[in-house]
Amino acid sequence: MQETTRKNAVFKKLEIHLNSSKINNENIDTLLLSLKIKKSDFYTLFPKKINDLCSYFFENIYNISSKKVKKRVLREKSISRRTNLFLSEIIKTFDSKKKTSIFFLSYGLLNPFLLSKIVYSLSSNIWYDIGDKSTDLSYYTKRLILYNIIRNSFFYWRKTLDQKKTLSFSERQVMFFGKVGKFKYSAKELLIKKFKI
């Protein structure tokens, strides 16, 4: 808990300056000096510099969104609607920190492996928190589908910078893949009955 508080304090000091595309791994030490942030503190908390700041930002977005939506998710029966609630809240939180979100998303686009890791972690956390126990698609297939929906939604938001359009875009994707899962499950059940597999 103490480390999270320390991370948050350092991140808040840096956040205003992260909105500038001039900040990078090579000149971050100069920024730390000007903001009177001890290098030892920073490198203990964020040893991989902007990579770790980026991961922390997305993790924080998820935690904020999760707290806001968790009770509504638990009341909802439909997995597609649960997923949509989570994803919508993430996009709203992302949009509320527009400049910082643009900075880290742009940074992630230049570091695709890092962005993939972050988005996969988000999809895994969402899947765990919505409590899906259905068997229409495999464990990894569902995460991969959600990974693509989240990634596409982030790219769509980055292109349009329009929260409303992005929410509509992500909702259509979630509903489409929900229907694919139901269709696959129904087809499997039909084959089992017909051929007694």
List the predicted regions and their residue ranges.
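Key DNA-contact positions within bacterial/archaeal DNA-binding proteins
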Residues: 40
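Alpha-helical DNA-contacting segments of helix-turn-helix folds
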Residues: 45-69, 103-104
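Amphipathic alpha-helical packing segments from all-alpha helical-bundle domains
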Residues: 110-132, 141-147
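Hydrophobic alpha-helical segments that form the core
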Residues: 139-158, 168-176
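C-terminal peripheral helix-coil segments that are non-catalytic and often amphipathic
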Residues: 159-197
